[in-house]
Amino acid sequence: MPLVSLSFASSSSKAMALCSICPRIPLRFRPKPISPFLSKPQICLAYRVYSSLQSTTPSTRDELGTVSIGFLGMGIMGSPMAQNLIKAGCDVTVWNRTKSKCDPLVGLGAKYKSSPEEVTATCDLTFAMLADPESAIDVACGKNGAIFGISSGKGYVDVSTVDVASSILISKQIKDTGALFLEAPVSGSKKPAEDGQLIFLTAGDKPLYEKAAPFLDIMGKSKFYLGEVGNGAAMKLVVNMIMGSMMASFAEGILLSQKVGLDPNVLVEVVSQGAINAPMYSLKGPSMIKSVYPTAFPLKHQQKDMRLALGLAESVSQSTPIAAAANELYKVAKSYGLSDEDFSAVIEALKAAKSREA
C-alpha cells in the first residue's frame, strides 16, 4: 500500500497547518436507499483534506450585504444560524414549511419567500438546514424545490446532516442547473449555533467554498474542506456516531455511580478534569442527574445519525458493535416518547431497563 503524503505550510501571522491527504485506495459507499430518488450505485470517492482553524479576514458589513443569502429551514439550528447572518449585516431571505417560524427572522430584517424555488431564484447563495435526508431531498428536488429557481452563477450549501448517497443526489440535481454545490454539515448543537461556534465539514465545489467562507465564519468557529461531495457527510456521521456512543456510556456511568452510593455530581467533576474530558459531560451531566433534558440536539436526530452511520459502516464492511448497541438504546428511548427531548434523555432508557430487571 503506498504511503500517504503529508505536506505542511505555515503563515507568518499565525501558525497554521494544511494537511493534504491523498489515499490511493478509494472509499466505497454502498448505502441503503432512504428515498425513492435513490438507487444502489457503487460510489468511489477520492478526497483531499484541508483544515482551517482560523477565520478568514472578516468582510465589512457593506461587503457582506452585496451577496444575497437564502436560508431554508428555521428549526432549532437553522434559526440561530440565520439570525447570526442577519446580525452581521447580510441580506437574508428565509423560508420554512411552517411560516410562523420565519416571523422572528423577518422581525430582525429578513425577507420571506413562500417556497425554496422562490428563495433560490432571488438569492446568490442559499443555505439549507433540514431535519433528515428525506426533507433535504424534498426541499432541494421536490415540488417548488430549490432546483427550480437556482441557475448558473449561484450556489447551494446544504448544511443538513444526511447520508452520502443523499448528498450526492442533491449535488447532481443542483449542478445539472449550472449552479455550484457544497455540502457543509455542522458539528455542534443549539448553543454553538446561537454563539456562532459551529464547525463546518465541507465538501464539493471549491470555488463555492471560497465564496461561502466569510458567511461560514459568521456562523462557525472553524471549517474543514474535505474534497469531493460525500466526504463531508461521511465525516459528520462518524463524529455523531462517536458522540452518541459517548453519551450512552456516560449515562451508564452516572447510574452506576448512584447505584454504588457515589455522588454523580462528583463523577461529573472527575471526568471533566481528567484525560477523558469532553465539554458534553459538564454541560449535560448536571441536568441528567436531575432528570431534566432541555433540547439542544433532539434524541430522534441522534438516533437517525446513528442509523445512517451504521449503514455507512455496513457499506464498507466495518464492524461497529459499540455504536450498534448505543443505537438500540436510543431506539428504546424513542419508544418511550423521548424523541423530542435532548439526546441526553437516553439515560431514561437505562433507568427503565433497571426497573424491568428489578
UniProtKB/Swiss-Prot annotation:
Induction section of the entry: By cold and heat stresses. Down-regulated by ozone.
pH dependence comment: Optimum pH is 6.8-7.8.
Main location: plastid
Control of this protein's activity: The ratio of NADPH/NADP(+) may regulate enzymatic activity.
Binding of NADP(+), residues: 70-84, 161, 304
A Pfam family reported for this protein in Swiss-Prot or TrEMBL: NAD_binding_11
EC number of the protein: 1.1.1.79, 1.1.1.n11
Targeting presequence: 1-44
Active site: 236
Key word NADP present: yes
Subcellular location per the Swiss-Prot or TrEMBL entry: Plastid, Chloroplast stroma
Domain of life according to the entry: Eukaryota
Keywords: Chloroplast, NAD, NADP, Oxidoreductase, Plastid, Stress response, Transit peptide
GO molecular function: glyoxylate reductase (NADPH) activity; NAD binding; NADP binding
Enzymatic reactions: glycolate + NADP(+) = glyoxylate + NADPH + H(+); 4-hydroxybutanoate + NADP(+) = succinate semialdehyde + NADPH + H(+)
Any one GO cellular component localisation term in the record: chloroplast
SUPFAM superfamilies per record: 6-phosphogluconate dehydrogenase C-terminal domain-like (SSF48179), NAD(P)-binding Rossmann-fold domains (SSF51735)
InterPro entries: 6-PGluconate_DH-like_C_sf (IPR008927), 6PGD_dom2 (IPR013328), 6PGDH_NADP-bd (IPR006115), HIBADH-like_NADP-bd (IPR029154), HIBADH-related_NP60_sf (IPR051265), NAD(P)-bd_dom_sf (IPR036291)
Note from the entry: Although GLYR2 acts as an aldo/keto reductase, it has no significant homology with either mammalian and bacterial NADPH-dependent SSA reductases.
Role description: Catalyzes the NADPH-dependent reduction of glyoxylate to glycolate as well as succinic semialdehyde (SSA) to gamma-hydroxybutyrate in vitro. May function in redox homeostasis and play a role in oxidative stress tolerance by detoxifying glyoxylate and SSA generated in glycolate metabolism and GABA metabolism, respectively.
Family under the similarity heading: Belongs to the HIBADH-related family. NP60 subfamily.
PANTHER family named in the record: CYTOKINE-LIKE NUCLEAR FACTOR N-PAC (PTHR43580:SF2), OXIDOREDUCTASE GLYR1-RELATED (PTHR43580)
Name of the featured protein: Glyoxylate/succinic semialdehyde reductase 2, chloroplastic
Source lineage: Eukaryota, Viridiplantae, Streptophyta, Embryophyta, Tracheophyta
Chain's gene name: GLYR2
